[in-house]
Amino acid sequence: MRKQWLGICIAAGLLAACSGEDVQQKTVSVPQPAVCNGPTVEISGADPHFETLNATANQDYERDGKSYKIVQDPANFTQTGLAAIYDAEPNSNLTASGEAFDPTQLTAAHPTLPIPSYARITNLANGRMIVVRINDRGPYGNDRVISLSRASADRLNTSNNTKVRIDPIIVSQDGALSGPGMACTTVAK
């Protein structure tokens, strides 16, 4: 009885394979719109606008023996982990984008998100959210996923041990906003 069923299944599979057209199917990855399963919240922070990517800051790289690959599709990226606070003096360092670091700006450093880009950062302890501009690389070697400027950290009410979620915001050339950072979110103007 088992042999008969096996034979029937094989024959059915062969017939199904022969009956269709000889067309190869390709899987195409189309970014899906951000899904919202709750109320929409208006958040403030950096003003997302289209900016040309910095060619030198967006190359895959290696640091301290570890390889970093720049995120090519931020629409399919989200990350959760601990935040660091970048507390340097104003104008004391240049960022990876070539700008002078300013702790009063709503900026952040991330090891692999495109520069410049924008992201919604959520403090998972208190639910606060802001938009930051990613303009630098880091943090490195301290198990942190993002380094926030002092202004960003203060707005989120974070410490160096606060768990956050990073959701990129994609800005198209016409200024339209999309991506994971726009789910249930509008950006205050």
Kindly label every feature range from the protein language model.
Residues 1-18:
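Sec-dependent bacterial lipoprotein signal peptides
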Residues 18-189:
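Secreted/periplasmic proteins
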